[in-house]
Design a protein with these regions (language model features):
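Soluble extramembrane regions of membrane proteins in the secretory/endomembrane system
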Residues: 2-311
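Juxtamembrane amphipathic/hinge helix adjacent to a transmembrane helix
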Residues: 294-334
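Extended non-globular C-terminal regions
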Residues: 321-506
């Protein structure tokens, strides 16, 4: 930043380590849209003098009107007042009053977060910072990561206190589009079968009103309620960030900022940094932030809070990269959602019924063995006995293999998100075609069984009309007949459920 004496009083700009740090705990009670209350813990850090025992006097620094302030907005999942400690200490040591708070979650989970109330909660934190006598109300900023960037859009629109913002790996597009992008891209990175990516698109086409996921189509962009990205903005991405659409995200931020008359947008890319700019696997303790990031973000915050003119390039650092486009074509389909849920519900009920019948047959068989009786349990005809058993086992293995492939994809993606190196598992690729082959074998086999049953039934009808003795078509025991039709129906609905997920389309 250019040194401007009229704004700095001829004093040198503070940097990381210019001040020692004092901290204290504060509590704020926030309320959700449903009226649920949560007591947030907050760590407030303030610049201290050289002794480290008393707060520094802003009048003796470039911050003659009061220290600038910063609060932090959490990303997805849970968050605590102990988070962001390293960045908060960096900023405080450069003269900022910082507040790190518990994430406002109330009684919600990731899929039903109360975004409007979360924004109000963070606004309440901003108001608290503004109420401090040693804080300059015109120099308060926000630091948002990942999901927090969605909430920051609401905060920026509704709060008059925010004068600049730092967005770390920001989510820009709607949750449906963001999920579609990062899951599809990550499946490609872990070399999963492309069929799983096509399945993701079908799952994300579920109607949110039916599955009670209102946030998936939450419209964070709402110019009718106020402009967005109208304040100085610092955007940072890591080259190993596998969750955000970096090129599309930056383009959208620039588009909205320029539309609202803001040309003060700085973009930085950092090599090796993951989704939250940590180095390595963030699941491990004490992972560091990307090289130079802490200096860059601190220097930018100091210069911007003082209103200085930036002399470095607006866009710099590692090249930002994006392998696929944003899936803006994905939207909710009510009919498909209802059909899939109905089929899934019936399939689960049939699986439970089939399991009960299998357990019952085992108990009956054990009873026969104890009593020395050799009579059959099901009484199925010889033709059906082997086929129904083989197809039942094949159907269950097909479903289990399919679900195992999905589970392995999820595990690999989670590790990738945390910053670990990609894990290539053969299961994520061959489970898809093998499931297809097994499913087709079941369909062909059962088709031959039912065609044979139709022939037999037709022949038996003729025998009945001639009043000739009639042999059993399916089984000579009611338990066997029930078992056959429940097993057949279970296999049918398993295949139908897999078909609705797109198993036979790719």
């Amino acid at each position: 930043f250019r040194q401007e004496k009229e704004k700095t009083g001829g004093m040198s700009l503070p940097h990381r380590g210019s001040y020692k740090i004092l901290s204290f705990t504060h509590y704020e009670t926030v309320t959700s849209t449903q009226g649920v209350r949560q007591k947030l813990r907050m760590t407030v850090r303030v610049p201290a003098d050289s002794s480290g025992q008393a707060m520094a006097d802003p009048r003796k620094s470039v911050y003659s009107k009061g220290f600038p302030a910063m609060t932090f907005l959490h990303g997805a999942g849970t968050g605590y007042y102990t988070d962001f400690a390293d960045v908060a200490e960096d900023l405080t040591s450069a003269g900022f009053v910082t507040a790190t708070v518990d994430k406002p979650i109330w009684n919600t989970a990731d899929f039903n977060r109360d975004y409007p109330a979360s924004a109000k909660a963070y606004e309440q934190v901003l108001a608290y910072l503004a109420s401090l006598s040693y804080v300059d109300q015109s120099r308060i900023g926000t630091y948002a990561t990942s999901e927090g960037a969605w909430i920051e859009q609401i905060v920026e629109r509704e709060s008059k206190l925010v004068s600049f913002q730092i967005l770390l790996s920001p989510m820009v597009y709607s949750p449906r589009q963001a999920l579609g992008f990062f899951v599809t891209e990550d499946l490609s990175i872990i070399r999963a079968n492309p069929g799983y990516a096509s399945m993701v698109q079908r799952v994300l086409s579920f109607d949110s009103s039916i599955v009670h996921l209102p946030n998936i189509d939450f419209q964070f962009e709402n110019n009718a309620k106020g402009q967005m990205y109208k304040i100085p903005t610092f955007v940072a991405y890591g080259s190993k960030d596998v969750m955000t659409a970096q090129v599309s995200g930056v383009s959208r931020i620039m588009e909205l900022a320029h539309k609202n008359g803001n040309w003060n947008v700085t973009v930085r890319g950092y090599p090796i940094g993951n989704h939250v700019l940590r180095l390595g696997n963030e699941a491990m303790p004490d992972t560091l932030l990307a090289d130079h990031y802490e200096d860059d973000v601190t220097n930018w915050a100091v210069g911007t809070s003082l209103g200085l003119k930036q002399t470095t390039s607006r866009i710099a650092g590692a090249q930002i990269y994006q392998s696929i486009s944003i899936p803006d074509y994905v939207h909710g389909h009510k009919g498909r959602t209802i059909l899939t849920l109905v089929v899934a519900g019936i399939m689960l009920l049939l699986l439970i019924a089939f399991t009960i019948l299998c357990i019952s047959s085992l108990i009956i068989k054990i009873g026969h063995l104890i009593q020395g009786r050799k009579e059959p349990v099901f009484g199925l005809t010889r033709r059906l006995r082997r086929v129904i058993m083989a197809n039942s086992i094949l159907s269950f293995f097909c479903l289990i293999l399919f679900l195992a492939g999905i589970a392995q994809c999820i595990i690999s993606i989670v590790n990738l998100i945390w910053g670990a190196a990609p894990e290539y598992s053969d299961l994520t690729y061959w489970s898809w075609p093998v499931s297809q082959i097994m499913a087709i074998m079941v369909i062909i086999s059962m088709s031959s069984v039912f065609s044979g049953l139709i022939e037999i039934a037709d022949r038996k009808t003729g025998q009945l009309m001639k009043r000739s003795p009639v042999n059993t078509v399916v089984a000579d025991r009611k338990f066997g007949i029930v078992f056959f039709w429940v097993a057949a129906a279970t296999m049918f609905f398993i295949m139908l459920f897999l078909a609705l997920l797109g198993l036979f389309l790719y």
